[in-house]
Amino acid sequence: MLENLNLSLFSLINATPDSAPWMISLAIFIAKDLITVVPLLAVVLWLWGLTAQRQLVIKIAIALAVSLFVSWTMGHLFPHDRPFVENIGYNFLHHAADDSFPSDHGTVIFTFALAFLCWHRLWSGSLLMVLAVVIAWSRVYLGVHWPLDMLGGLLAGMIGCLSAQIIWQAMGHKLYQRLQSWYRVCFALPIRKGWVRD
């Protein structure tokens, strides 16, 4: 039943040779490049953010570590070929023929969006969740993922954020103090110059 649903949704979303070239180009940009918002925003929040923003970055890092491990485990337990490997649909994005479930891109961006929903602001989390859905759509549209690959990424992200909250409650303050002290040593000159926040 799930396989039939997966195939039906894929057939509805997947681009075809008749799709507008500009749509395919836009989808390629979204699928490949928009994920860079994750490291860029994390760096900005740490270097110029207040204590709350830096703690958010640490929580996100923990959540990502857990969710990617969960994703890796799920992929080994439930291996699934990509659509183009099975000669289903149309592929418009070069990709290795490795397992597709769950999506690494989906795992990362959904974890990031869920983290902001849980620990930052509703508006920022909602905006990032829209971005996550758009990235998920683009990778199915281009034929490198199944819809359920993205659902798997969302599930991994939920587990990652829940685990990060538990870990933070147990040792978050000590972890923040340790990382903050390392940061002050490594970035002593930029901090002294006022280029980044202490």
UniProtKB/Swiss-Prot annotation:
Catalysed reaction equations from the record: di-trans,octa-cis-undecaprenyl diphosphate + H2O = di-trans,octa-cis-undecaprenyl phosphate + phosphate + H(+)
Membrane topology: Multi-pass membrane protein
Membrane spanning residue stretches: 28-48, 58-78, 121-143, 150-172
Gene for this chain: ybjG
CC annotations in GO: plasma membrane
Annotated localization: Cell inner membrane
Species of provenance: Escherichia coli (strain K12)
Function noted in UniProt: Overexpression leads to increased undecaprenyl diphosphatase activity and to increased resistance to bacitracin. May have a preferred substrate other than undecaprenyl diphosphate in vivo.
Protein's name according to its UniProt entry: Putative undecaprenyl-diphosphatase YbjG
Domain of life (superkingdom): Bacteria
UniProt keyword Endoplasmic reticulum present: no
Gene3D superfamilies per the UniProt record, alphabetical: Phosphatidic acid phosphatase type 2/haloperoxidase
EC number(s) on file: 3.6.1.27
